[in-house]
Amino acid sequence: MILGFVEVSHESLALAEAEAVCGAEALGGGGVAAGVPIPGLVAVEVPDRDALTQLAGRLALARRCLVPIPAEGDVVVAAGGEGASGGSASFRRLGRPSGGGADEAVLASGRAFKRAGGSIDLERPDRRFWLARGNEGREYLLEQVAAIDRVAVAQRRMPLLPFQRPVSLPPRLARAAVNLGRVTPKDRVLDPFLGTGALLAEAGLLGGRLYGIDRDPAMVRGALQNLSFLGVAADELLVGDSREVEFGERSVRFSALVTDTPYGRSSSTGGEAVLELISRVLERWSDRLTDNGRVVVVVPSGLSPGALPGTPRFRVPVRVHRSLTREFCLYEKAGLTRSSC
């Protein structure tokens, strides 16, 4: 295992940090409680650098994945040591826009790298180094392993899809929810409130096998349009009541249930209160989860602690749209019981 860092970036840092840790868990690693105390970074443990690159390909609420360079308290000396192997590099301050004025530690690190035999290239460097100041004032030298492709995520925004509804989760938040579910290739993923298919689309892009249910035939047709547009195929999408319908493969078990519960005037619950509907649906499908299965459910904000069944591992309010806040709740199968939250 190696130590890595994720630079998170979202107004809900709690959700961004949880996404990074759960994403690392999906790759055989996890979070590190005693990480380097650098603001804006989450410490994770992954099998190797390739896994850190894979993590960058999974995440949506982050900027980059990095590894620490041993500095023994002097980042300039460490930068010189890296320059001895040649090649080009860039040096910047983490969390500070380029062109923000002179930074002596950054400049000195670049000079040391160059003196040792390397060269400086700010446009297309072979390696990208970042300096970061910890909470205790100590300087750290980090090397970027991979950057998050935020443009690709933005290209999946609702206005760019063929089937559109104003209340659908933005792709960044949908991807974060799927990462909380630790979805990996070939995992079967269920969304019992399919909607526009935003959650299943993100699960499919991570290689998951997709199953969805919605009582509105128009939503199922629209979700199929969106999935096809994004190059994602579903195993089975059903029209009907999530408490009653059954998939063709009756014994199918799911690694993750990930859903955004109905809300807004355009959503249909068949006249049932949303909280009661959620509880009944989770009760119906929880025994179809694999032993280490997870449930990620996005619910109306402001619920009382006992409003949902089970004990969540993680629960945080997140602003989804300008005037709409929802709560992201993560359950392990073992914690999805009738005890109060």
Can you describe what each PLM-predicted range is?
Residues 13, 20, 72-140:
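N-terminal auxiliary segments of SAM/dcSAM-dependent transferases
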